[in-house]
Amino acid sequence: ATMGYEYVLIDNWWNTNIGYERMGQLIKYAQSKKVDMFLWYSSSGYWNDIEQGPTNLMDNPIARKREMKWLQSLGVKGIKVDFFGGDKQETMRLYEDILSDADDHGLMVIFHGCTIPRGWERMYPNYVGSEAVLASENMVFGQHFCDEEAFNACLHPFIRNAVGCMEFGGCFLN
């Protein structure tokens, strides 16, 4: 709040590190500071064997709608869905199913680890953006990524944003 952020993202493993029970308290605290929340989810599916959770919620229509109803009840403003399985038809359908269900529950959506934008902002007013870039989070993997960070951060707005809105998770490491 002190830094003027309107939204913050609670990233992967919040379901185990914070837990569902305590998430309501955290969201109320953030709202008292006039900061709204996005929560991270895995896209899951049989193609996705990642360990980061929560998993097995976004690829199942019943579980997805139940989770989105819970998010709406807490006042969460959006979700960031990560680790999609390519551009096959089934995955493209999943993107639109997530957007449609999220819109029904008043949730904004960011896609991460995903395909390039497909014009979804015209059909889904709750679509915020898609990453589809080599983002700052890669700086933890090696010096090469750190050395390229300034170049990439300047390049993405002019090259990648020509395709459509971009979600870019900038990082600062100390």
Residue ranges and their predicted role:
Residues A1-Y7:
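An acidic-aromatic substrate-binding cleft motif
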Residues D11-L173:
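Aromatic- and carboxylate-enriched substrate-binding clefts and catalytic-loop regions
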